[in-house]
Amino acid sequence: MAKTKSRGRRVEKSADKLEKKAQSLFEDTKSTGEEGGDDSNEIDASLKSPFFGLVDSNELDYFKQAESTLNVNAFDSDEDREGFIRSVLEEARGKELKLVTNQICSKLMERLILFASDRQLKNIFGQFSGHFVALAHHKYSSHVLETLLVRSAALIEKELIHDDSSQNEEEREEQEEGEVTDPMEGLFIKMVDEFKPHLQGMLEHQYSSHVLRLLILILAGKELPSTTTSNSTLRSKKSKIARKMIEIKDNQDFNKSFQTPSSFKIQLRELCNSVSNNQNSKRMRELAIHKIASPVLQLLIQVEGLVDRDRTFWHLIFLKDSEDKNSQEEAFVEYLLSDSVGSHFLEATIKNDGARIKYIERLYKLYMEDRILKLAKRSTTGVYIIQALLFKLKPVDVEHILDEIIPELSNLISISENQNLDLGQRLIDASISRGNYRRDEIIEQLFLKFAPNYNVQDPQLKTTSEFIENVLQLTGSTLGNTRDDWPTAEERRRSFFLEKLMEYDYKFVICVWYNFLALPVERFIQMCFHGVFSHIVERALVVIPSSEGEPKPVLILRKRVLNLFKDQIVNMSCNSYGSHIVDALWNFSVLLPMYKDRIGTELQGDSHKVKESTYGRLVWKNWSMELFVRKKYDWKSLIKQQEQAYYGVNDENGTTSRVKKPIELKMEKLAEERRLREEAAAKSESGYKRRHEDDNEDDYAKKQKLRGRRR
């Protein structure tokens, strides 16, 4: 057969173009950091799909069965489970590397690590020694390695706290059996030394970058977040979903920070130096907008202050705080403000405590202060930077941002396109933290956007349901669907937004009541049984505090709302969502004993159905229905106690103190947090000035100070 002729001219031209483009793009990086580039190429060549052998078919069946047994966890006692784990580890001895690189067996190894004892954990760690870099770059073993690192961090803290002398006898036994007896701290440092030559290559690797993030968190003594629930700094959204599907749950070592030895600070400093070595601004800015390397760089900026006063990573990306506007930096910041990865990087560096406030203020003053409104209109990028700045800048700058955005708030928010709902909530929080700054204007803008025909000062019963229709988008939602559709993420976001508005000001609660009355009763009852919209009904059932005094029209309106639940109490009590609403009606019907009695009568009328339901029994208990049925006088005494609590609780002096509203409690909490931040900042600043003065003193002044002359 004749050889196939490869296409020549077009391929050569395209290859030449790509080569020239790459050369021009990375010319600066190569000229300043040639050694680092060569090292990363060596890493890629040496870590091509590490292969430690195949698992035998018979072994695979055994380990697969063991994995399912551990997943079910149907052991009679912890001793039975420990014996089972011991036998599986005995069978897996010498095959650990094959198992962790196998898709099915890697899940088994992860479960074994989660349940392993301290001795077993050290033995597994010892088996991986010398292969950590290869395992970190593998699709399956990298997850096993992350779990091993978390358990190792917990064991290091345990060894630090407990006295080693009590373990000498046990260690001798281990040594006789040929097991690993070194302290976990030493084993961990050896592993870090394995990673050091390859750190720059790990930054951009799909799997090893996650291991590197976890390594940084452990060395810095930071909290190790969950891998399945919260917005984890360890895993991507896709990875968290996958872990939920394979049903691997975290143990008690996650969502915690661990005590670390002093040697870890040295290791963290060396790690940071290894990453930043031979790097220039161009290269670091490329990493900042790289979708894999960017989260690692965010973490390095967050922790570098622990070991580096010069903030090397920050100043490789941005200029020093004493320098003026720079055209290249301006172009880079503009890209961060308009790119999804870049905006997330800048938002994270602002939110985290790693970067100094003066660094953030410099970027704000030079590149963002004059175009707040323009950035707020970038609903997928720039607006998140603005939200982060609201809680980092000085009060004067925060008020400037509020002054720019509040007059245009109605134009910035778009419910139908799910744009800037978070901005509205953050503005409310910022307004509260500034002592309800421009509160009335915010309320006016929100009503202008969602209920332009609603008269806030003099609402009428003829009010339409436009407010909740515009906010929740009930038309076209899953409300009333008979196919058991799950509520969508958009419906949850809108629901949270409306709950925030009702918490912010009681005017929104009154408006929601009028909208409930304007809805068809069937539509309203459907909301009570909906997984998301039922929360709106529940949050709307709040009463004006007695200190403010409930006007008579509002009291009458409250009665009208209670009438909407007539003949629906039993069905709602037996529903997982509606039962919470019935519980809330106890407080909502305060000062209205007749309505309480009517609800109790409904529950008693079909008590058999209510008591058969799990949720119904809870409602029966919360409404004290046993007293209602058997001791009506005692039940009415509960109502009297509730009314007394509503008007205020008598203290020892005989005075009456009212219960504070949630917004007042939140303002007090924010004020306390602000006070603590200011105290910490002042303390840090005074310490820095004192050290700076000491450095600038001449030798004679230092001697005089030591002698006690300058007290």
Curated annotation (Swiss-Prot):
For this UniProt record, give its keywords in alphabetical order, as a comma-separated list.
Answer: Nucleus, Repeat, Ribosome biogenesis, rRNA processing
UniProt feature, compositional bias: Basic and acidic residues: 9-33, 676-702
Identify the stretch(es) annotated as Disordered.
1-43, 161-180, 676-711
Tell me which Gene Ontology terms the entry assigns under biological process: endonucleolytic cleavage in 5'-ETS of tricistronic rRNA transcript (SSU-rRNA, 5.8S rRNA, LSU-rRNA); endonucleolytic cleavage in ITS1 to separate SSU-rRNA from 5.8S rRNA and LSU-rRNA from tricistronic rRNA transcript (SSU-rRNA, 5.8S rRNA, LSU-rRNA); endonucleolytic cleavage to generate mature 5'-end of SSU-rRNA from (SSU-rRNA, 5.8S rRNA, LSU-rRNA); ribosomal small subunit export from nucleus
Please classify the protein's predominant subcellular localization into one broad category. Answer: nucleus
Q: Where in the cell is it found?
A: Nucleus, Nucleolus
What InterPro entries does its record include? ARM-like (IPR011989), ARM-type_fold (IPR016024), NOP9 (IPR040000), Pumilio_RNA-bd_rpt (IPR001313)
Pumilio repeats sit at 91-126, 127-162, 194-230, 279-314, 328-365, 519-556, 563-601
The keyword Repeat belongs to this UniProt entry's keyword annotation: yes
Q: Which GO terms describe its molecular function?
A: RNA binding
Acidic residues bias (residue ranges)? 166-180
Could you tell me the superkingdom of the organism this chain comes from?
A: Eukaryota
State any GO CC term.
Answer: nucleolus
Q: What is the role of the protein in this entry?
A: RNA-binding nucleolar protein required for pre-rRNA processing. Involved in production of 18S rRNA and assembly of small ribosomal subunit.
Q: Which family does it belong to?
A: Belongs to the NOP9 family.
Write down what this protein is called.
Nucleolar protein 9
State the organism named in the record: Scheffersomyces stipitis (strain ATCC 58785 / CBS 6054 / NBRC 10063 / NRRL Y-11545) (Yeast)
